Amino acid sequence: MGSLLGLCLIVQIITGLFLAMHYVSDISSAFSSVAHICRDVNYGWLIRNFHANGASLFFICIYLHIARGLYYGSYLYMETWNIGVILLLLTMMTAFVGYV
């Protein structure tokens, strides 16, 4: 699970950087810049889909990682488990801020 999480995170960072190169955050042209990415940028639609679906896959891998920890009783290691919970909360907050 950890290697899949790392791969998903790397894909998210790379696709996010490529999308940020063409995105305009001005309120009057934000939608037009997304349409520009999908229509005019080479494989822009694919990069956008990888970025959107990669986020879902990232969280599925996180939940599977947590489920494995619950199954094997890793919650008994309190320090490690608490750090994992903090990382999960930080990841969820970052995803929310990135979505908004």
UniProtKB/Swiss-Prot annotation:
Alphabetical keyword list: Electron transport, Heme, Iron, Membrane, Metal-binding, Mitochondrion, Mitochondrion inner membrane, Respiratory chain, Transmembrane, Transmembrane helix, Transport, Ubiquinone
Residue spans crossing the bilayer: 1-21, 45-66, 81-100
Binding residues annotated for heme b b562, in chain numbering: H51
A single Gene Ontology CC term: mitochondrial inner membrane
Cofactor note: Binds 2 heme b groups non-covalently.
Protein's UniProt keywords contain Cell cycle: no
SUPFAM superfamilies the UniProt entry points to: Transmembrane di-heme cytochromes
GO molecular function annotation: metal ion binding; ubiquinol-cytochrome-c reductase activity
Co-factor requirement: heme b
Compartment annotation: Mitochondrion inner membrane
One GO biological process term: mitochondrial electron transport, ubiquinol to cytochrome c
Topology relative to the membrane: Multi-pass membrane protein
Keyword Coiled coil carried by entry: no
Pfam families (UniProt xref): Cytochrome_B
Disulfide bonds: none
Stored InterPro entries: Cyt_b/b6_N, Cytb/b6-like_sf, Di-haem_cyt_TM
Main subcellular location: mitochondrion
Annotated residues for binding of heme b b566: H65
Function in brief: Component of the ubiquinol-cytochrome c reductase complex (complex III or cytochrome b-c1 complex) that is part of the mitochondrial respiratory chain. The b-c1 complex mediates electron transfer from ubiquinol to cytochrome c. Contributes to the generation of a proton gradient across the mitochondrial membrane that is then used for ATP synthesis.
UniProt record similarity statement: Belongs to the cytochrome b family.
Record note on quaternary structure: The cytochrome bc1 complex contains 3 respiratory subunits (MT-CYB, CYC1 and UQCRFS1), 2 core proteins (UQCRC1 and UQCRC2) and probably 6 low-molecular weight proteins.
Other noteworthy facts: Heme 1 (or BL or b562) is low-potential and absorbs at about 562 nm, and heme 2 (or BH or b566) is high-potential and absorbs at about 566 nm.
Name under which the protein is recorded: Cytochrome b
